[in-house]
């Protein structure tokens, strides 16, 4: 019997750790982990700036998606003192086949978390911050009010910091989206993750067209907020399916599209069906730009929050250019 979900995993094998973090995947047959191609290589973290970022995160008892999702860009981002904070705990109520975040029954919300996040943003001197969360289907509003509290706390502590939220879908949470939008983040990101044909096997707890409508509704509520969405490729999707997804996002007036390579966290997760080449990513970016997105980022190591601050500046410039200013 595997240890309980809150037990220490330091002495466990990789397979045992996976069972602790992902008990809902224990029944899945092991999937082979393919060798990464030469174009997917990152430097190991360990710079003084990386260590300082890690220290601030730990001192404030914060959770980052950089760590929980096993992001390959953590060394680069933390060296620049960039971190994506994951609020409302480290335990998700869903069990997506691609995701390395722990699944289970989450704890209650920490009322001090907004202040802790705001203090960390101030100490890191962030000009742009990304706030994401686990899915909290157990909460009546899906955690929307907590998102709003975090946004307001950052605004008070660090008024010049621009704020990007990467939210869950708030499925069956009436009024939740409106609460987050009313707090006026600068960027509202919600990832589609994959094409609709793959939802049942990759993202079974979500609904593709609900996510499209969520993004469209943000623009209806506040057209000044930039909207953003991201997908992974290499999950078995076809090129035509990706192009149709681009059209769906443009119909919802989404400003920014990110496309990155799916990387398999453990043998219990969805297998990598293909490694997309840099040239294929460049071709996707060319098509997406032609379809009218303000900004497109497509590469093997592209992730939703990678270079988010620089991308926000580019988004603002692209909007002004399109408006002829």
UniProtKB/Swiss-Prot annotation:
GO terms for cellular component: cytoplasm. Its EC number is 2.8.1.8. Binds 2 [4Fe-4S] clusters per subunit. One cluster is coordinated with 3 cysteines and an exchangeable S-adenosyl-L-methionine. PROSITE patterns: RADICAL_SAM (PS51918). [4Fe-4S] cluster 1 binds at residues 66, 71, 77, 305. [4Fe-4S] cluster 2 binds at residues 92, 96, 99. It is found in: Cytoplasm. Residues 1-32 are annotated as: Disordered. It catalyses: [[Fe-S] cluster scaffold protein carrying a second [4Fe-4S](2+) cluster] + N(6)-octanoyl-L-lysyl-[protein] + 2 oxidized [2Fe-2S]-[ferredoxin] + 2 S-adenosyl-L-methionine + 4 H(+) = [[Fe-S] cluster scaffold protein] + N(6)-[(R)-dihydrolipoyl]-L-lysyl-[protein] + 4 Fe(3+) + 2 hydrogen sulfide + 2 5'-deoxyadenosine + 2 L-methionine + 2 reduced [2Fe-2S]-[ferredoxin]. Pathway: Protein modification; protein lipoylation via endogenous pathway; protein N(6)-(lipoyl)lysine from octanoyl-[acyl-carrier-protein]: step 2/2. Residues 78-294 form the Radical SAM core domain. InterPro entries: Aldolase_TIM, Elp3/MiaA/NifB-like_rSAM, Lipoyl_synth, rSAM. GO terms for molecular function: 4 iron, 4 sulfur cluster binding; lipoate synthase activity; metal ion binding. Residues 19-32 have a biased composition (Basic and acidic residues). Keywords: 4Fe-4S, Cytoplasm, Iron, Iron-sulfur, Metal-binding, S-adenosyl-L-methionine, Transferase. The keyword Iron applies. Its cofactor is [4Fe-4S] cluster. It comes from the Bacteria. Belongs to the radical SAM superfamily. Lipoyl synthase family. NCBIfam families: lipA (TIGR00510), PRK05481.1 (NF004019), PRK12928.1 (NF009544). This is Lipoyl synthase. It comes from Beijerinckia indica subsp. indica (strain ATCC 9039 / DSM 1715 / NCIMB 8712).
